[in-house]
Amino acid sequence: MIGFLIALMVLPLATAVLLMLFRDSAGQNTARWMALIGSVVTLCVAVTTVAKYQSEMVITEASQPVQPRIEWRHTWLTYTPQLDSKSGLTPAPVKLEFYLGADGISLSLIALTALLTISAVLISWETIKERAAEFYICLLVLESCLIGVFLAFDLLLFYVFFEFTLIPMFFMIGLWGGSQRNYASIKFFLYTLVGSLITLVGLVALVLAAVKGGVTTPFSIPELASHFTAHPIPIQTQVILFLTLSAGFMVKVPLFPFHTWLPLAHVEAPTAGSVMLAGVLLKLGSYGFLRICLPIYRQACEQVGLPLIATLSVIGIVYGSLCALSQRDIKKLVAYSSVAHLGFCMLGLFALNAEGVTGSVLQMINHGLSTGALFLLVGMVYDRYHTRQLDDLGGLANRIPLIAVAMVFTSMASIGLPGLNGFVGEMLSLAGMFKVPVVGPFYAVIGTSGVVLGAWYMLTMVQQGFFGPLREPHDVHDPVRDMSPREACAFLPLAVMCVWIGVAPQPFIDLMKPDIQGIVTGYDGSNARTIGGSSGTPESLTAVDR
């Protein structure tokens, strides 16, 4: 199993290196096929890893609050701090490790990343005509960095991959984006970089506190969680560290009011860039909260995180929905819908109970599938009409019926129609918040308004753009082709997953259930409680290679 984890991270990077070596001799078509084959192989490895994870791991009790079920640790540096002059004791050596791991949460997000990368490659097949090899290199490096974030159980490794995701996305927007691509890419880079630098200060302070507390592996996320659960940091210090660490995560989500970089980045990014940005990159913020903040800063999350993040989340849900309702550019409409949908993720996450966190993780996956599919379809419309303005489009179902049907289906999934994927995540997130004493129902009721507003702006977009009298730009004269087989191959896997999760969500919940219960232990006192299953001691699957 350890080999699978390493392969997941190395395969996209190796494909990118091959493309880099042969980019001069390889033509456009060769570059496309190399990128497609590399991304398909990565998805196959991801699916195989999930299947083996479910069927072959030994079931044991979890030894720590946050423990990867598969892990590989390699010590690459040992450092002995200076003698403590006050106590006269020799400090224990501090180890720096290369610590990879996986559990049900990370494997679910890795599979999502691998699936969306294939869709991104296919949708760029004919639209990226200049420097195609370089474009696919950026895309594959981005995939490798994203997978690295989800596999990292070491703070240093996590931060390195977290930051490296900025570089390929910066180039994808800046080199292959729209007319304002330079401004959009710089704004995206600076916004996220400033937030991440503040997060770095929080990480350094956390590591120093761990070293002072005698932790010999101060970068190990599971050991930090275990240590600070048993020996909590004083609440005033904990709140400061929580807020510092949260800065980069809030920008990356993005939470209101740190969202202003997102609409422009989406509008100017190529279709593949928007798919990866909305589908996976925006999940890094909520994943950082889930993986680091919730297990380590428990009192701060309860006393400060819940009211602060829940307030910003419901504001983002309502504000993002109203902004989406006012948009005439379809791509910008979908971008603002992401602000609203990710508000549900954060609302469920900071319910700090099993239902809310389960709904939050499901919503991360569901948003990646449905919004990724929406950006694919918007890109298809733009490729045919060279506009995304609703004022220029209407009655398109008469000309491109397959794309229209796909847009209706995906809009229903995004709204949260029962039977499709969006319903499960939103309802669990809201149910978790309803359980929070005193303030929970207040936040949940406001959040519920986002469901109504979501139906309003998505149905308005579908009705105005795809039904009613035919309205097309004046410069369109040739017969407009409908969805091609290549585009269908990019879209259909996402649609299948939307139906699968909507109709049968339990296997996906079961995959993540023990890990979520480990994270919420100590918050709701329901460590043995399961979602959609029987009560009992939470199970964990462990395989260690040291």
Predicted regions span which residues?
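Alpha-helical multi-pass transmembrane bundles of energy-transducing inner-membrane proteins
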Residues: A26-A31, C138-V141, C145-I233, T237, ...
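Juxtamembrane/interfacial segments at transmembrane-helix boundaries in multi-pass membrane proteins
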Residues: A51-E97, L197-H259, F289-L308, G356, ...
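Alpha-helical transmembrane segments of multipass membrane proteins
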Residues: A16-L21, I118-L122, L146-G148, F171-M172, ...
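C-terminal ends of transmembrane helices
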Residues: A16-Q28, T117-K129, F171-Q180, V253-V267, ...
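Structural signature of hydrophobic alpha-helical transmembrane segments
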Residues: M1-L11, A102-T113, L156-P168, Q238-V251, ...
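Transmembrane helix-loop-helix hairpins at membrane boundaries of multipass inner-membrane proteins
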Residues: M1-F4, L21-L122, E126-I137, T216-P218, ...
